[in-house]
């Protein structure tokens, strides 16, 4: 079915779809786990990527989730924009009044931070982006240290280049490696040095969405495959960047 934009949609009607497979797919996605469904040439569905000749495999990925820890206009502006974009957003705020403002904006998950030594339990997953906007050294170090031990695909912290360099140095003095602190993005945003809270929110959210789409499209982009082969005039070891395939 061609579309005016130049794309197309293929429609496949399965009159006797296995409801159990669809329920299992839904439940796995609801638990924040990626899942695949395989459609055989006979029209039957199977859960998972099944190596069946002629079959097609469709992968479904958990939606982007955003966790923001901070205070002030930067945190609220980003949370408001992300929520309006349909992104599941969690706010961790130090100020009780700001927490009430966030709830009035329609943000359901709002936690008030008390002391750096008693952080909320980490529940990030590989589809979670974390942004720090605290502007306090003690809180900054503790929150980033917690995020770094988790699986979030994006960790960002608001601040200048000099501020970012200092925060990474502090984290390294408490045991994190340079490779680990390299996960932290700073300064954040596609457009550098944004001062207005709303403009900064647009810049940061665009960077987060870009990182999420890159993870979805190229899930093995950071994985390497070492191929050892005895081939004349070719070095023994070659390093290839892995890619994904949608055909079963």
Q: What name fits each language-model region?
A:
Residues 1-111, 125-129, 207-248:
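Segments forming oxygen-rich coordination pockets for charged ligands
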Residues 18, 75, 137-140, 164, ...:
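Alpha-helix N-cap/loop-to-helix initiation residues
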Residues 19, 116-119, 189-195:
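A short acidic, often aromatic-flanked loop/helix-cap motif at beta-alpha or helix-coil junctions
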Residues 33, 87, 151-152, 176:
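Residue-level recognition of short, well-ordered coil/turn positions
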Residues 50-54, 118-119, 175-176:
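Short, flexible segments with low predicted structural confidence
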Residues 100-103, 140, 164, 197:
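Alpha-helix N-cap/helix-start motif
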Residues 111-173, 201, 209:
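Phosphate-bearing ligand-interacting subdomains
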Residues 152, 158-248:
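Adenosine-phosphate binding glycine-rich loop
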């Amino acid at each position: 079915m061609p579309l005016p934009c130049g794309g197309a949609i293929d429609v496949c009607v399965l009159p006797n779809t296995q409801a159990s497979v669809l329920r299992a797919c839904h439940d796995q996605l609801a638990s924040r786990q990626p899942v695949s469904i395989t459609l055989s040439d006979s029209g039957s569905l199977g859960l998972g990527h099944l190596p069946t000749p002629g079959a097609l495999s469709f992968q479904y990925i958990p939606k982007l989730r955003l966790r923001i820890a901070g205070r002030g206009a930067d945190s609220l502006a980003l949370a408001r924009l992300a929520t309006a974009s349909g992104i599941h957003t969690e706010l961790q705020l130090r100020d009780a009044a700001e927490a009430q403002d966030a709830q009035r904006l329609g943000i359901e998950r709002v936690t008030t931070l008390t002391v750096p030594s008693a952080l909320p339990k980490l529940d990030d997953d590989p589809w979670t982006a974390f942004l720090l906007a605290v502007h306090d050294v003690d809180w900054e170090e503790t929150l980033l240290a917690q995020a770094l031990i988790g699986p979030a695909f994006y960790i960002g912290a608001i601040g200048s280049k000099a501020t970012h360099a200092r925060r990474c140095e502090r984290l390294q003095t408490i045991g994190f490696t340079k490779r680990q602190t390299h996960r932290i993005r700073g300064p954040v945003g596609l457009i550098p040095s944004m001062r207005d809270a709303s403009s900064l929110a647009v810049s940061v959210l665009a960077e987060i969405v870009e990182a999420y789409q890159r993870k979805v499209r190229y899930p093995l982009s950071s994985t390497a495959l070492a191929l050892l082969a005895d081939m004349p005039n070719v070095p023994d070891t070659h390093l290839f960047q892995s890619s994904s395939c949608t055909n079963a």
